[in-house]
Every structure is written in C-alpha cells, then in structure tokens.
C-alpha cells in the first residue's frame, strides 16, 4: 500500500493507480497458483516413491522364489542320485548273492563227483510192480531218479513267467524242463505283450525238473524260502503219483470276502500238511475275494479229516457256515458225509431271492417264482425222479461237468458276476458269457459248468427267476436246443 500511495503521490493520476492495482492483483494470482500447485507436485513425488518401493519388493520376492526353486531342483537331483546309487548297490548285492549261489552249487557238484569216484554206486532199484509210482516222500530219498530231480515250487508270484522261473533255477544247475501250472478257465493277457496268445492265469505253483539229482537237492537248500516280490516261495521234491496222495485238493466256499490266504490256511492247518492254498480274487478288486478257495493237503486222508470236521461249520474267522468238499470229484463228498445245503438256502432267504415259495409238486423241485416254476415244469415234468434220470444225459459236458444255461442277462454283464452268483452253490468249473463281436457286450445269455449235479440243480432251483439288476433270469440245464 505504501508503494501504491507513493506512486499515486508522484504521478497523481487515476489511470496510474488502476494499473498498479491490476499489477498487484496479477502478482497475487500468480502466487496463489504457485501455492496451489505445490501439494500436487508433492503427491506425485510420493506416488513415484511408493511405486519404486513396490517394484523393489517384487524384485526381492522374485529373487527369493528363484532361490527356492534352485534349492528344490538341487534337492531333487540329490535324491535321484541317491536312489540310483541305492539301486546300483542293490544290483551289486544281488549279483553277489547269485555268484555265491553258483559257487555253492559248483562246490556241491565237485563234492558229489569226488564221492562218486570213491563210493561204489548202489544197485539200481527194482521196478515197482504194483501199478503205481510208489508212495515216495517229500525229500525224494525213497523215490526214483526222476523224483529226485523233479521239484515242486509253491507260492510263486502271480505275474512270474516260466522263463523267469527257468532263469532263477538255472543258476543252480542244468534244467531239463519247467512247467508253470495255469488255470485254463481264467484267461490271462500279458500286460507287457497284449498281442501274445492268451494263457490261463497262474495258479501260483509249478514244477522244475533238473538233469542231475544233486542240482535239485542244492536248489531246495538254496532257494527254499526265497522272497520274491510279495511272496516267499516253497521249494521241495515233487512226489510220484499214488492213491495215498491223489484227490487231496479241497474246494471251500462261503468264506468272508476279506479273508486272506494265511487265515484260510490257519483253519485247515490242524488237519495235516498243506501243500498249497489259493483264494479266488475278484477281477479288478484287490481287497475282496469271491469267497471261494482251495486247499491241497499232502495226503487224501488229511483232506478227508478236514471235510468231516469243517464242512457246515462256522470257524472263528468266518461269519457263515463254510462248505468243504473234494475239488473236481463229482459226488465224492457225499461218500463221507451227507451234503449240506449252503446256509443262505433257508425259506426266508429263498423268498427274498426268488419271490413266493410254493409247495413242491409230486416231490419234484420246489418252484421259487412263477417263472421258475413254469421253466422247471417244462424241463423236469416228472419232478425230481425225472431230473435224476436226466442226469446221465446232462453229464456229457467237458470233464463230466453239468452245463447250465442262463438267459436274459444285461448287455453289461461280465463273467465275474456269474462266478459270484453260482459259486456259493458248489464247484464251478467254467463260466462263459456269449458276446457280440461288434459291440463286445453280452448277447443276453451265457453258460456255467458245475462239477456236481446236485449242486447244479440246487443253483437252478434258487436262481431261476432271480432278479439281477432289473432283469429276471431264466436258468435251466443246457440242452441240445440251447445255443
């Protein structure tokens, strides 16, 4: 104001004063503009600093991640290297064991050669004139030369092949022949060579025949108890065939679906020496079985004792009574004890299986549903007497089996379903589902062959009219008209 007044006093004009006031206003506006711009510039600087700090943090995180990745890769590489070293050490150890076995076998051969040169040879045993190969013994000392070279190998892994068996046992001595016993009714496709001809599934045992008896004895000493995969194999001398050891194989049904092979052997072990055992597994299900197994005893009399003691009983490891009988021997069980019906064939459950239960007509087979009755009346018009008379014509199946015809099966039906359906009634020899070659689905019918006529008739009585899925089955003995 002093400046304005001074200029006014000097110039004294109104115009000059107005100009000065305008200049002051302009200066004030510039100052105000500058003052307003200062906070904006400060905010921009703060934002730039924050962005820079964020970039630095991201770079630090990226560096940490890269370091972690490098450490993980290094750890994985170290683990792989360690695993390879362990595998190499295992291979070296296995080679050392094989080499030691070969050295032991060579020592035995040399010792036998020395003994043969010093000790005079015994006279050849006189041939057996009683029509069989003799009772023999498990160690083969009383058997023929063939017996003393022939070994039976039990508890083989399911996937082990004849070539692998030959490779294992040839490390001891020269082998004349190897035979792996397979189940001809179960088709096995080699997963490593699907195009190869299908074979029966391994039954878990086989035979190895050596050229020299001393090699066979050495194989028993060295390989018996060897751990292969998840099995411990049993190697012993095979015995010649005789009446005392024939027919010592038992068929067992009604077992819990979760029973193990060890539990099955524990039931039968008190009755004699078990040569081998087996439980049928469900295809595609390693945790459940078909509830059916086999036990082979050393002698038939041991198997007979087991049948008398266990058939129709409920062992502590079972929930239902079990059926025990000779395997693949029609009617043999009935010579010892009266056959007993499976526990589930009671009137209450029969009503659930096949509908209303009717009174038998003319002492014939009971009808478990209207459809079942009609079919059985057609197949067996004279009741059970006609059925017994027809048994001679129905026994024309392979191996004396009784073929059963099953109709109205669903397209998705597999053979395992029929195994489960007919297995509880008795010994099933084979199952066949007829499939359309173009769709690979069931054409609506199939066949089941059973060993025993009474069991086959029982299965027909119970299952004819049985509802499987949403279909009512028609079950009857196969005739020449069934195709």
UniProtKB/Swiss-Prot annotation:
Family recorded in the similarity comment: Belongs to the RRM elav family.
Function: Required for the proper development and maintenance of neurons presumably by affecting RNA metabolism.
SUPFAM superfamilies: RNA-binding domain, RBD
Source domain of life: Eukaryota
Keywords: Repeat, RNA-binding
Pfam families to which the protein is assigned, alphabetical: RRM_1
Encoding gene, per UniProt annotation: elav
Protein name according to UniProt: Protein elav
Region (Disordered): 120-146
GO biological process terms held by the UniProt record: central nervous system development; embryo development ending in birth or egg hatching; germ cell development; negative regulation of mRNA 3'-end processing; negative regulation of oskar mRNA translation; nervous system development
């Amino acid at each position: 104001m002093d400046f304005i007044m001074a200029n006014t006093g000097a110039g004294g004009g109104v115009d000059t004063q107005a100009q000065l006031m305008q200049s002051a206003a302009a200066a004030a506006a510039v100052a105000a503009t500058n003052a307003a711009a200062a906070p904006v510039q400060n905010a921009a600087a703060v934002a730039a600093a924050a962005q820079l700090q964020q970039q630095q943090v991201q770079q630090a995180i990226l560096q940490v991640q890269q370091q972690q990745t490098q450490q993980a890769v290094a750890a994985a590489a170290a683990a792989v290297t360690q695993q390879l070293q362990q595998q190499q050490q295992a291979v070296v150890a296995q080679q050392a064991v094989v080499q030691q076995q070969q050295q032991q076998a060579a020592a035995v051969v040399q010792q036998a050669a020395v003994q043969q040169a010093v000790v005079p040879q015994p006279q050849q045993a006189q041939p057996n004139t009683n029509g069989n190969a003799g009772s023999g013994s498990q160690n083969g000392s009383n058997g023929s030369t063939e017996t003393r070279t022939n070994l039976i190998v039990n508890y083989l892994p399911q996937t082990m092949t004849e070539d692998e068996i030959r490779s294992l046992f040839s490390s001891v001595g020269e082998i004349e022949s190897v035979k792996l016993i397979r189940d001809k009714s179960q088709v096995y496709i080699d997963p490593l060579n699907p195009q190869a001809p299908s074979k029966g599934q391994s039954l878990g045992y086989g035979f190895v025949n050596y050229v020299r008896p001393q090699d066979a004895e050495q194989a028993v000493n060295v390989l018996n108890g060897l751990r292969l995969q998840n099995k411990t194999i049993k190697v012993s001398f095979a015995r010649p065939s005789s009446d005392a050891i024939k027919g010592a194989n038992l068929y067992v049904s009604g077992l819990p679906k979760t029973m193990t092979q060890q539990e099955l052997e524990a039931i039968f072990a008190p009755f004699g020496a078990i040569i081998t055992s087996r439980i049928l597994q469900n295809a595609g299900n390693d945790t459940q079985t078909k509830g059916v197994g086999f036990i082979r005893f050393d002698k038939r009399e041991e198997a007979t004792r087991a049948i008398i003691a266990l058939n129709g009983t409920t062992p502590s490891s079972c929930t239902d009574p079990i059926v025990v009988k000779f395997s693949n021997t029609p009617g043999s069980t009935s010579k010892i004890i009266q056959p007993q019906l499976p526990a589930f064939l009671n009137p209450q459950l029969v009503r659930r299986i096949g509908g209303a239960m009717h009174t038998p007509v003319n002492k014939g087979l009971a009808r478990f549903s209207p459809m079942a009755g009609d079919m059985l009346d057609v197949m067996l018009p004279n009741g059970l007497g006609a059925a017994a008379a027809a048994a001679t014509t129905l026994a024309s199946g392979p191996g004396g089996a009784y073929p059963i015809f099953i109709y109205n099966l669903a397209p998705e039906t597999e053979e395992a379903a029929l195994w489960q359906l007919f297995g509880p009634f008795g010994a099933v020899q084979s199952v066949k589902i007829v499939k359309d070659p173009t769709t690979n689905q069931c054409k609506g019918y199939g066949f089941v062959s059973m060993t025993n006529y009474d069991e086959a008739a029982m299965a027909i009585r119970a299952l004819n009219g049985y509802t499987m899925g949403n279909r009512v089955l028609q079950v009857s003995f196969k005739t020449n008209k069934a195709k």
